C-alpha cells in the first residue's frame, strides 16, 4: 500500500462531528521553507491543500487535511541551539522546573523531552540528571549519546525496537510541539 502525503478528514478531530464548515481555503501550498543541504535528502516539494474548517458542534478550528508526519519531520531543519533567544528561554525553563523537582526529589532525577530537537533543553539540566529525548528528525544525530539517551522516533513510539520501553519520569517537557498535534 502506497503511503499518501496527506489525507482529508471527514469528522472533527475532537468530538467526531461530521458537520465541518469551510472557513478559509488557501488552496495548495508548500509545506514549509527548507534549506537544501548538500548530500541531504531533498525536502518534499509538492503542494498540499491548506484549508481551515470549523466544527459546528465544538467550534474547533482545524486543518481539513492531515499531512504525513514523515514528510513534516524526517528532514526537519530548525535547531533550537542556533537561536540565542530560544537558548535563553530554554535555560530559564530548565532552571525553574529543576528547582521545583529538586524540592521533591534530590537524586536519581529522570527527565524526558518529547520533541527534543538538538538536545539544547536537555543539555541545560545538571549532569546528575538522567536525560532522555525523543525526536523523529535527523537532528538528534548531533546529540551526545553519552550524556542523553536518545530515541530517533515519533512519540508515541512507532519503531518496534522502542515500543517496549517503559519508564516513569520525574519530569516530562515538550516545547513547541503542541501546535503540530
What role is predicted for each listed range?
Residues 146-160:
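Conserved SAM-binding strand-loop segment of SAM-dependent methyltransferases
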Residues 85-107:
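Conserved alpha-helix/loop element of class I SAM-dependent methyltransferases that forms part
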Residues 137-139:
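Conserved SAM/SAH-binding beta-strand->alpha-helix loop
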Amino acid at each position: 500500500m502506497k503511503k499518501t502525503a496527506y489525507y482529508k478528514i471527514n469528522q472533527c478531530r475532537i468530538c467526531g462531528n461530521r458537520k465541518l464548515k469551510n472557513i478559509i481555503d488557501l488552496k495548495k501550498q508548500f509545506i514549509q521553507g527548507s534549506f537544501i543541504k548538500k548530500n541531504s535528502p531533498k525536502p518534499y516539494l509538492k503542494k498540499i491543500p491548506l484549508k481551515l474548517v470549523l466544527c459546528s458542534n465544538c467550534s474547533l478550528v482545524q486543518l481539513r487535511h492531515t499531512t504525513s508526519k514523515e514528510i513534516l519531520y524526517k528532514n526537519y531543519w530548525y535547531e533550537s541551539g542556533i537561536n540565542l533567544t530560544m537558548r535563553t528561554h530554554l535555560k530559564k525553563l530548565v532552571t525553574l522546573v529543576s528547582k521545583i523537582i529538586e524540592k521533591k526529589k534530590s537524586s536519581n532525577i529522570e527527565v524526558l523531552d518529547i520533541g527534543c530537537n538538538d538536545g539544547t533543553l536537555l543539555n541545560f539540566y545538571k549532569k546528575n540528571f538522567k536525560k532522555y529525548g525523543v525526536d523523529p528528525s535527523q537532528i538528534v544525530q548531533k546529540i551526545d549519546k553519552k550524556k542523553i539517551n536518545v530515541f530517533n522516533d515519533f512519540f508515541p513510539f512507532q519503531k518496534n525496537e522502542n515500543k517496549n520501553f517503559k519508564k516513569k519520569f520525574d519530569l516530562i517537557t515538550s516545547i513547541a510541539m503542541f501546535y503540530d498535534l
